[in-house]
């Protein structure tokens, strides 16, 4: 955002003292990489990104989705397309018997973690988030997947709600809806010989945005 008139030929990237420019937020297209979920990309129709890699990675995580499918395509400059898969986001979590199979409302997962992907230097990654209506993408994270242990049965989940509920002087309930945070407290077991490796991983990500996933299935 420009902070004063006559702002011509001033590069925001070199304005370290915010004399001409104020960093307000990422533009709509790049909100998927701003490190937060509160302000998603919003667009009618598909949201697509094409990213080039100079390092090795093997995992893509997408959060805050309002979409129907996610397509992940990886292209090698010599071999061509080496991975192309579409991941449906429709969820069966609400279906647990014959009645809910017939009458439960369709729901879609808002998060997706894709592992075992062949990223390496020179490859190109294309991510397409598809919806027939309005599409939202909260955040996209790309990195290396590290196994740190097996989750245990007493892992707990929670919800931190920042909404306000209070009564006014006449007793009427006033509700102000705000954002919320989903929380999880993972308990997991790991081999003793893995302790130092896990500690090194935690040290590297201690001041960075990171994804912790319980995985799919009871053994993850």
Question: Locations of the language-model features?
Answer:
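Extracellular/virion structural assembly segments
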Residues: 25-45, 55-220
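Short strand-edge motifs at loop-to-beta-strand transitions and within beta-strands
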Residues: 47-49
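Hydrophobic residues in beta-strands and at strand termini
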Residues: 2, 51-53
